[in-house]
């Protein structure tokens, strides 16, 4: 009988990327943290849902902190040291995610709010009556 063929999965190579950009998208329901190099290629990402939170707990500041720590840990393994932070959205996890990145050991050089604001574009959805 023939010997079984060994399957080798794709192994991610350890890149040395000292500078990067952290994109934090914080909505009322979830927080997504993507860490890219300066040209925009994603190095690591995490979200409150990927960190194990479900339902309404994904929108909490603690879930955003956990997601930011997980993404920062993987970026530090790739050799990242300095980051620029771009924050988008009105969610409750904005500040805690930034604080978690700082505590993880990444040096923040810039924080910019890039939340899209309409110049009277589409009509807003009607107000909820609860």
UniProtKB/Swiss-Prot annotation:
Summary of the function given for this chain in its UniProt record: Located on the platform of the 30S subunit, it bridges several disparate RNA helices of the 16S rRNA. Forms part of the Shine-Dalgarno cleft in the 70S ribosome.
PANTHER family in alphabetical order: 40S RIBOSOMAL PROTEIN S14/30S RIBOSOMAL PROTEIN S11
GO BP term, example: translation
Family to which this protein belongs: Belongs to the universal ribosomal protein uS11 family.
Protein name: Small ribosomal subunit protein uS11
Gene Ontology CC annotations of this record: ribonucleoprotein complex; ribosome
Gene name of the record: rpsK
Gene Ontology molecular function terms on file: rRNA binding; structural constituent of ribosome
Keywords: Ribonucleoprotein, Ribosomal protein, RNA-binding, rRNA-binding
Residue ranges of the TM segments: none
Subunit structure comment from the entry: Part of the 30S ribosomal subunit. Interacts with proteins S7 and S18. Binds to IF-3.
Record's keyword annotation contains Cytoplasm: no
InterPro entries: Ribosomal_uS11, Ribosomal_uS11_bac-type, Ribosomal_uS11_CS, Ribosomal_uS11_sf
């Amino acid at each position: 009988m023939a010997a079984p063929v060994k399957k080798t999965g794709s192994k991610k190579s350890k890149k040395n990327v000292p500078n990067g950009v952290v994109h934090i998208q914080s909505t009322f329901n979830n927080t997504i943290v993507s860490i890219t190099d300066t040209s925009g290629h994603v190095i690591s990402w995490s979200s409150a849902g990927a960190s194990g939170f479900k339902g309404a707990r994904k929108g909490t500041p603690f879930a955003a902190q956990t997601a930011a720590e997980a993404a920062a840990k993987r970026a530090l393994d790739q050799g990242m040291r300095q980051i620029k932070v771009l924050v988008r959205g009105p969610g409750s996890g904005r500040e805690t995610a930034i604080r978690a990145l700082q505590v993880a050991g990444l040096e923040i050089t810039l924080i910019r709010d890039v939340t899209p604001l309409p110049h009277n574009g589409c009509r807003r959805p009607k107000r909820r009556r609860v």
